[in-house]
Every structure is written in structure tokens, then in C-alpha cells.
């Protein structure tokens, strides 16, 4: 009973995997225009839950180091805007107005260091989904067992019992390959803005 709740990354995995199943089921049943919208929203969601959350976590680590040494709101804001500029590179002009955006993100106050769970959980779900697409119904018992385990085992141990090595770059690459395939599918729709 004390370990029945799934750890944060696995909780994110369950919901994301279900969304992937729904998306996969709908993608062949919708119109071209609906597919453009759905794919655009999917890519936006992948960015927000993987990349943006990863950069939030990087910012949190840096900020906590700053706080330990004594810092100011201005210094934290500089760290945040540098983080945004690194995140977007030269693809987007990041206004200095965003320097204070960090102060409006409730996770930083209410659930510190939660944001990694979005990145981890989403990439884990994407990697598992890629396996599901390869293995089909043979994957289902493993997936149900992973969900049923809740928080009774550490994610790396639980997943290893089902043949998934989350310490392997190859495993995570499967999730990133899914993201890449969605971006390519979107580009193939010849959408111009």
C-alpha cells in the first residue's frame, strides 16, 4: 500500500501512451484538413512536453545553485532568458520581456523539479509505443504489467524485467525517432504559413 502510486515519470507515461493510441487510431479516419490540425497540435505538444520541460529542469537546477550562493531576481531572470535563447537558438527572436516568465510557472513553486517527469514520461511512452507498433498485441501483457506495478519497483528495474533498458541511448532514440517521423509527416503535408 505504501508504494502503490506510480512514480511521476510512469504516471505521465500512462496518459501519454493512451493519447498515442487514440491519435494512431484516429489518424487514418480523419480528413486531410483535420490531419493537418491534429499533426500540428501533436508536434506542438511534443515540443512542450519534451524540449520545453527539459529546459525548465535545466533552469531549475541552475537557479537552485544560484540560490545556494545567494542571488537576485534579476540574476535568475538573466539565467532564464539565457535558457530560452539556448533553447530556440537563432530560429526565434526571444524578447527580453520573457526574462521574468519563470515567475509565472507554478511548477517551480508548488512542485519543484517536477518538469523532468514530463520529458521522461513522454519519451518513455514514445519509446514504448514504438515497441507496441513493432510487436502488436504481444506487447500488451508487458504494458499492462508495467502499469499494474505502480510504484512497487523503480522504473529501471520494472522496465528491465520486460526487456527495456532505459540506460540505453538506443531505447530513448526510439522515442525521438517517433518525434522525427511526425515532423517529417507534417512537412510532407506541404503546409505554408
Task: Name each model-derived stretch.
Residues 8-12, 37-41, 74-78:
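An alpha-helix initiation/capping motif
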Residues 1-17:
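Post-HEXXH active-site segment of zinc metalloproteases
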Residues 1-6, 38-45, 64, 68:
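Short beta-alpha connecting loops at secondary-structure transitions
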Residues 3, 17-29, 33, 49-193:
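C-terminal, non-catalytic "cap/extension" segments appended to globular domains
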Amino acid at each position: 500500500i505504501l508504494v502503490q502510486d506510480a512514480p511521476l515519470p510512469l504516471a505521465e507515461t500512462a496518459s501519454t501512451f493512451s493519447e498515442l493510441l487514440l491519435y494512431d487510431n484516429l489518424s487514418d479516419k480523419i480528413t486531410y484538413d483535420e490531419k493537418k490540425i491534429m499533426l500540428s497540435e501533436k508536434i506542438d505538444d511534443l515540443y512542450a512536453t519534451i524540449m520545453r520541460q527539459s529546459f525548465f529542469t535545466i533552469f531549475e537546477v541552475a537557479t537552485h545553485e544560484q540560490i545556494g550562493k545567494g542571488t537576485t531576481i534579476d540574476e535568475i531572470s538573466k539565467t532564464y532568458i539565457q535558457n530560452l535563447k539556448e533553447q530556440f537558438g537563432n530560429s526565434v527572436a526571444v524578447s527580453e520581456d520573457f526574462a521574468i516568465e519563470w515567475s509565472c510557472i507554478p511548477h517551480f513553486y508548488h512542485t519543484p523539479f517536477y518538469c523532468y517527469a514530463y520529458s521522461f514520461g513522454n519519451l518513455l511512452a514514445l519509446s514504448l509505443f514504438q515497441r507496441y507498433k513493432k510487436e502488436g498485441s504481444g506487447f500488451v501483457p508487458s504494458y499492462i504489467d508495467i502499469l499494474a506495478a505502480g510504484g512497487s519497483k523503480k522504473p529501471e528495474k520494472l522496465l528491465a524485467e520486460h526487456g527495456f533498458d532505459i540506460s540505453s541511448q538506443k531505447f530513448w532514440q526510439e522515442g525521438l525517432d517517433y518525434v522525427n517521423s511526425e515532423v517529417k509527416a507534417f512537412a510532407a503535408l506541404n503546409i505554408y504559413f
